[in-house]
Structures are given as C-alpha cells and as structure tokens.
C-alpha cells in the first residue's frame, strides 16, 4: 500500500507540471521594450550634454563637483543647462574673460555648488508640469505655481560682510568692532518659472510681461516656451527626454537670482531708498543655522557665530523673542525683502522703489516740504515715521499687483496708489518678487493729506495726538484723520502749535463770566502724556492771564470723566480750525490765503475773519475779536526763517500761533447790551402777556410756543 501511494503522488505531480507548462508559457508578454529602448528616449543626461559638444562649461561644473556618475545613472532629475556661449556672456557680465572651463575650475567649491544646484530640480518635470503644485486637500493645483525650490542650499551662500557694507544702525555696531560678520541667507533661494500655464491661470498678459521685462531686450512673451528667472527656454529646446530625467536648455545661464533686498542694495540708482530700508535690518541669531553651517564646512572653518540678516516686518518679525527691541515702536516694513521663500510656490512680493532722482524731487517739492522742515535730510527721518513711507511702496502679493490692475490698485489704507506703467524706469526679477524702479514716489495717505505735516513736526505734538490717535479702540478717539484724509475734498487746516495749545480759554467758564459776571474762568493747557492728550487746568488772573494750577484732567487712566472732558474740548477746537475749501454750495468756502474771502465758515459752523494772502494770511475767531486779542498768524520756522504753510494733496496746512475761539457772549446778552439792536431784540424777546392772554382763548387754541423749556 505504501509503494502504491507513492506512485500515485508522482503521477499527480507529473500531471501538474504538464498542465501548468502552457499556462506559464501564456504569461509571456510580447512588450517590445523588454529588449530595446524606446526610440524617443535619449541618452543619459551626461552623455547627451557631452555628445552635443556645446556644454563644456556646464560639464566642467558637473565634473568638478563629482556629479558625472550621478548624471550617467538612472534617476529623476530636471535640469536647465546653458551652452558655452551663454557661459561666456555670464562671465563677461562679471568682468571675467578667458577659457570657460578654466574659469569654472577657478571658482570656489561653494560657488560651483550654488551655481550648478540652482539649475537642477530633484524631480522630473516636463515643462507643462512646472506650474503645478500638489495639495493634500485638493489634489493637483494646475497652473498656479510660479516658483520652486531647487537643489541649491543657503549653506553654499555664506558670506563674510566687511564693516563698510554693514547697515549703519546700532544693531550692527558689534560687528564693526569685529571687522565684519558672517551672514547666511534668509532661506534657500527659489527659482521662478514663467510658463504659459502660469500666464493663463494668473491672467498675466503680454502687456504685463512687457512691464515686468522693462529694461530687457529679446525677452518676448512666450506661450510656447518659458522662462527660468529671466533665462529663456525656447519651445524647440524644452522637454529634452533623457534616460534619467528631462533637460530644458536655457539661452542664458540659470544662476541664483538676488532677492529684493539684494537688488535694491546693489542698484546704484536706488541708494536713497536702500539706506532707509537698511535701518530695519537686524542680525538675527538662529542656533540651528549656525550649527548647520559649521557642520557643513567642518570644525574650525568658521569660528564666529553665523547670523541671518532679517528685516523687522509685519509678516513674520514684528516682535523680538529676546525682548531687546520694541520692534513695533521702532517701526517695520510690510514684509521682509530678504526672505527668499516669501510667498511660497504660488506668489511673491512686489516693491516700487523710487530712484534717487525721484526721492530727491519729492524731498525738494511742496509735497515733501513738511518732511524737509521737520528733519532736514532723509537719513534723519525717524524709523517710526519712515517705516510708514516704506510700507506704502511694498505690495504683499504679486498676483494682485499685476500691471493691468494698477489703475485700481490700492495701498495699505485702501487708497488708490495711482501707479502708471510710464512711471517704471526699469524692472528687476528677484527670487522673491519684482522690483520696479520708478520715477515717482508713492507716499502713504498720511503724508499726502493736510494733517501730514502735523504728524511730523515737533511743535504740533498735541494737535497730532488729537487728530490721529493710534489707539482705535479708545472711546475718546476723535478719529479726525479719517475725515481729513479724504482725497475728494479740499481743506484748510489751521493748526495751533503746542505753545498755543497751552493757552485755551475754557468756553464754559469764560461764557459764565462774559454773560453773567460769574468769574470762575479757567485756562486749559493741553499736552501729550503716554500718547494721549491731557490738560492742566489753571485759574485765571483778573487780567485774563494764567493763574494757579487747579487740577489735571485726563491724566489718570481711571479718570474717564476727565478724558471725556478733554475729548469734548479737543473736538470743539478741531471743528473750529477746519475750513472746507471746495464746498460750491457755501459762499464762505474757499482757500483762506487767496484773498478772496473776508470771512469763512468752519466745519463746526463758526465764522472766521480773514485778512492777508499767502504766507501772510491772518485769521481771527469771534472770541479773539471780542477779547481784543490780535489775529492768529502763520508761525515762522526757526530753521530757515520760512512760514509754516504747506501745500498738500487735499488742501493747505497752516501752523498758527494761537487757538481760534468762538465768542463767549451769547446773542441774547450781546443784543441786550447794544442799543442799536434794541427794537429788534425786543421783538425777538416778545411779550409774555400776549401768550398768557391767549392761553385760555378757544379761538387761539392752535397757537403753540416755538420753544419749550423741558421741566
């Protein structure tokens, strides 16, 4: 039995083999590429470049970096090589001539790595895929990518900056003492890919491209090829397929583009703007960067700490983790122009940078007069003042700032910037945005409006705080800057100086004295404390001069009633010192210094008497005339003996030497004391007996008093 069972098992296995053989044979796939390569598949990347005979410089980079075998083997690379002619132009732009490969060999190892890696992506991308991004939530986002990270690393761009090239602020003094500083880039630089797919998705037009490329030649808007930074890849030189990746052959060397900070600092025509921008540069210590650099270059190669040059900005550096700098008090940029990855794959920034000539023209013009009067020189403008100016020249998003949108583009406060294509002298492509050098300045609305001079002068600090209080949540914030920043109206803004604001005749107590003989007159002396206006209240001497101090109003944070009193008085003052200049329906509306109106109507409904023209204009309120006080005059500046009168975009500003005040005497008491008005006064007063006799008469039951006194 045992032998018989073994025979049956052998027979069964033989049958399995016989039956299974045809099945195994049927699994044979006749796929033709098992034994041969596709005809469209080229050589490996290295062989392709070598066989062409036009890429000796690029291959010198490859060989010097030991990358030959990598580019011969299978892998997944996308490369943007340039031929030897392009490298000759590249070296010539740097003042170098000679044999291309020799010039490559003479470069430092880090320079070679930085240049080579900037032309390589560690994935395979056909040209139409360069604008795609992947999203965990939405899958593939097609056509929305503008930039990509390359194989290049900030570790190959460490620089030692000598004292002369360091920012001039105190933040960098310690490095001047050390004879310089080691600085790392703020992130690894990305490369821009201007593809037809991105053009279509973003709406970037041919006219837009002409502005972006202003100053360049032979850079046409291309819907078939594409650009890498500003290097052109023509349609017949893209998507070269090799065994281990794709080549897109550029007309120029694909080198790491500078960031916006580097563009501005290296362009001679932008020196003035660059100097202001550098006031916000800060040596930021990042331990992980310092460790990475020293590990990369080896122990002892760099003994000092390595810092990152960053800029105070509202996007990612508005507070100091070490609490050494009050950044918001110091002032910030809108975003960091040195941040190489700002905007990510799909967006970046824009900066409109006025040329030195444009900055000088603005400074010397009537629009910049108030800054010149306050500070004398661009470099003397405080950082918290100039930061607002610089922010207005930054745009957070390239996509929302395409040239075809400039006619509707608004600044950070929502006002039209009024940038025109003809304003642009030249455009620069940076790794993190576009820098447009312009022949115009675009000041913020605060520096265009009539209250602009008030904000910067050291003699109008009280009125400055009254007009624009940065604490928008303060219930007593009058917010008059929102009214005065309207560019659709024209204003006269009369601004009492700080000295004038120290002598305000309180209208309530002075009215009691003028009308009823109750002498409890007070003089209020306004000043700024902790950013808010407060007042010292003084008794009044018999001759109307300031007497003893009675109390201080609004200084205590718990003194809410006092704060309300101060706000009430300030509102009266502001209403009295604003005259609308272009109200066609008001005969007493116009510019006070043109000599056409002897009287003008204020915003609050008071009437001012006006005399003189231009800088010699004089103004008087009814209360001033009533008290026999002289007219208010435009003050003379100490610096250049010039009158403090300013032409602004929405009107004229006058610094005056006294507060204008309404009459203290009421109409009733004025008319009752003047015999010339007696008959009319008696008519107005009427006869109470008439109303008493008619009160019970049914024939006159519909007669009601015009004025009623509430109980």
Describe every region a protein language model picked out.
Residues 26-711:
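Mature, structured domains of secreted/extracytosolic soluble proteins
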């Amino acid at each position: 039995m045992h032998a018989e069972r073994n025979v049956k098992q052998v027979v069964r296995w033989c049958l399995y083999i016989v039956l299974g053989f045809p099945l195994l044979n049927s699994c044979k796939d006749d796929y033709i590429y098992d034994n041969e390569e596709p005809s469209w598949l080229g050589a490996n990347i290295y062989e392709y470049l070598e066989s062409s005979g036009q890429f000796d410089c690029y291959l010198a980079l490859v060989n010097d970096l030991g990358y030959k075998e990598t580019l011969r083997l299978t892998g997944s690379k996308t490369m943007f090589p340039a031929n030897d002619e392009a490298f000759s132009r590249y070296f010539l732009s740097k003042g170098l001539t000679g044999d291309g490969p020799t010039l490559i060999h003479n470069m430092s190892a880090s320079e070679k790595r930085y240049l080579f890696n900037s032309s390589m992506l560690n994935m395979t991308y056909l040209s139409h895929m360069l604008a795609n991004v992947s999203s965990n939530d939405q899958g593939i986002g097609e056509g929305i990518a503008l930039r990509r990270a390359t194989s290049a690393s900030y570790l190959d761009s460490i620089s030692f900056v000598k004292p002369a090239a360091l920012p001039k602020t105190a933040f960098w003094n310690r490095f001047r003492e050390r004879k310089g500083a080691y600085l790392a880039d703020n992130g690894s630089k990305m490369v821009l890919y201007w593809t037809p797919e991105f053009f279509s998705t973003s709406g970037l037009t041919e006219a837009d491209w002409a502005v972006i490329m202003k100053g360049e030649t032979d850079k046409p808007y291309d819907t078939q090829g594409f650009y890498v930074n500003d290097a052109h890849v023509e349609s017949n030189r893209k998507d070269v397929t090799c065994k281990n990746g794709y080549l897109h052959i550029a007309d120029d060397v694909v080198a790491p583009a500078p960031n916006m900070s580097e563009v501005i600092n290296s362009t001679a025509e932008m020196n003035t703007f660059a100097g202001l921008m550098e006031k916000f540069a800060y040596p930021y210590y990042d331990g992980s960067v310092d460790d990475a650099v020293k590990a990369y270059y080896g122990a002892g190669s760099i003994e000092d700490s390595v810092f990152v040059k960053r800029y105070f900005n509202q996007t990612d550096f508005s507070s100091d983790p070490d609490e050494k700098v009050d950044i918001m008090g110091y002032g910030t940029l809108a975003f960091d122009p040195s941040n190489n990855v700002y905007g990510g794959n799909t967006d970046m920034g824009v900066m409109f940078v006025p040329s030195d000539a444009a900055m000088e023209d603005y400074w010397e013009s009537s629009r910049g007069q108030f800054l010149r009067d306050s500070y004398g020189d661009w470099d003397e403008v405080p950082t918290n003042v100039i930061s607002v100016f610089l922010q207005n020249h930054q745009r957070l998003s390239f996509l929302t700032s395409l040239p075809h949108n400039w006619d509707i583009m608004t600044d950070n406060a929502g006002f039209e910037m009024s940038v025109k294509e003809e304003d642009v002298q030249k455009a620069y492509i940076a790794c993190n945005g576009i820098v447009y050098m312009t022949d115009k300045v675009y000041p913020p609305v605060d520096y265009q409006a009539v209250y602009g001079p008030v904000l910067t002068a050291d003699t109008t600090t009280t009125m400055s705080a009254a007009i624009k209080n940065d604490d928008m949540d303060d219930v007593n914030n009058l917010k008059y800057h929102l009214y005065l920043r309207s560019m659709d109206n024209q204003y006269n803004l009369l601004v009492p100086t700080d000295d004038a604001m120290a002598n305000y005749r309180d209208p309530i107590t002075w009215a009691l004295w003028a009308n009823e003989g109750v002498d409890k007159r007070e003089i209020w002396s306004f000043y700024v404390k902790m950013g808010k206006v407060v007042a010292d209240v003084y008794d009044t001497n018999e001759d109307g001069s300031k007497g003893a101090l009675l109390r201080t109003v609004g200084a205590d944070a718990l003194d809410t009633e006092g704060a309300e009193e101060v706000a009430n008085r300030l509102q009266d003052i502001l209403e009295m010192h604003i005259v609308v200049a272009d109200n066609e329906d008001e005969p007493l509306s116009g510019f006070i210094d043109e000599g056409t109106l002897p009287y003008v109507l204020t915003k609050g409904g008071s009437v001012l008497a006006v005399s003189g023209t231009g800088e010699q204009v004089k103004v008087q309120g009814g209360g001033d005339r009533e008290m026999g006080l002289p007219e208010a005059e435009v003050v003379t500046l100490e610096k250049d003996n010039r009158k403090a009168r300013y032409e602004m975009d929405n009107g004229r500003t006058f610094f005056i030497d006294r507060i204008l005040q309404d009459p203290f005497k009421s109409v009733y008491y004025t008319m009752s004391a003047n015999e010339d008005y007696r008959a009319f006064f008696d008519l107005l007063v009427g006869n109470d007996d008439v109303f008493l006799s008619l009160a019970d008469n049914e024939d006159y039951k519909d007669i009601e008093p015009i004025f009623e006194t509430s109980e």
